Amino acid sequence: MRLLDDLRAGLDAIDAAHLRRVRRTAYSPTDRSQRIDVPGGEPREILGFCGNDYLGLAAHPALMQAVGEGARRYGFGSGASHLVSGHSVAHARLEARMAALQAPHIPDADALCFCTGYMANMAVVSAMAQAGGIQPAQDCTVFSDALNHASLIDGARLSRAAVKVYPHVDLAALEAQLAACGSRNKLIVTDGVFSMDGDIAPLPELLALAERFDAWLIVDDAHGLGVLGADGVGVLSHFGLRSERLIYIGTFGKAAGGAGACVVAHRMAVDWLVQRARTYIFTTATPPAVACGVEAALDLIAGEEGAARRARLAGHIARWSDHAQRLAARFGWQWMPSPTAIQPLVIGENAPALALAAALEREGIRVAAIRPPTVPAGTARLRITLSAAHTEDDIERLARALEAAGQSQQSAARAA
């Protein structure tokens, strides 16, 4: 069939460019190591440096207990969307908790839960582009960092607003774009922590531009909530920001160890999202038990255990940074210094990055090789992520294995 032939040709092109994505099946809970399927063999235990469970909470007994108790109390499914009959007291409690956490940074804060971070980001950008009832967003411009997450990019596309992409964290370029913009409604959109580079957005400077040019500042804090700021409150706390024009998106599938997301903003902006956010209105609400689990995670994050886990993670980051700097200098890779759990090593081309990841897996270590279109062409990388669940020995084992893989690759290149 011609349609299948077209698909086959497209898949062949993906293979030729070393860009095929594959799924791996895990047979055990998310932790520092997991039993993972091995092509052509039996599943085996592999030490992971590729997940987003930054505090090691995904399999925490307190979270599992909270989810179980929530299911016994509220059942499994929500049964409907939030605006029909699916909004549980468990959702309401979680929203109140998130609003309280961000209240020092967003005056008159309210919150709204979403099923995923992707849905939250798409909703906020597309709905806020229509603020004031402009449909489509004919008098709105979205200003988006070049390295923003795909969900923010898709939200801008869905909004049908004008979109201006500014070079990564280039404040001068953004200022020039804002100065030249005649739109009544302006949205500055950014990751808080950039997911592939690990750097933190210059939010104080971005907020100053938002104030100067009367724009909203939308911050996706997927990788900051639980890790950055006082008591893990996130990137707004990290910088000590406060403004009515801030819209904060925190996701629960990373440091919080669960699933879902929450938007925190001025109560009027949240009410607007209830009226206009399509990914909130037209989908079944997250199971209430999940909200119970996330609330338990927030308890841990705010307490002594959360502080201890953040301190352990910070120690791992410092230890790994020393190794990464040394290895990058030796093998000609690009080390991207990051104060976060995301620790990229840019290799360059796709094939060498894949080969290094494969060599690590042969040693029982799993690291993701990230390639275009997720990252720009020529910047394929090993996206190494650290967790409080790791041990110091785990960090040393990764360093030894990567050094051996780099040496082998370097020797092969010299012999060719």
From Swiss-Prot:
GO biological process terms held by the UniProt record: biotin biosynthetic process
Name of the protein described by the UniProt record: 8-amino-7-oxononanoate synthase
Pathway terms, separated by semicolons: Cofactor biosynthesis; biotin biosynthesis
Catalytic activity: 6-carboxyhexanoyl-[ACP] + L-alanine + H(+) = (8S)-8-amino-7-oxononanoate + holo-[ACP] + CO2
Names of the cofactor(s): pyridoxal 5'-phosphate
UniProt-listed Pfam families: Aminotran_1_2
Residues involved in substrate binding: R21, H149, T374
Annotated positions binding pyridoxal 5'-phosphate: G117, Y118, S195, H223, T251
GO molecular function: 8-amino-7-oxononanoate synthase activity; pyridoxal phosphate binding
Its EC number(s): 2.3.1.47
Swiss-Prot/TrEMBL keywords: Biotin biosynthesis, Pyridoxal phosphate, Transferase
Residues modified to N6-(pyridoxal phosphate)lysine: K254
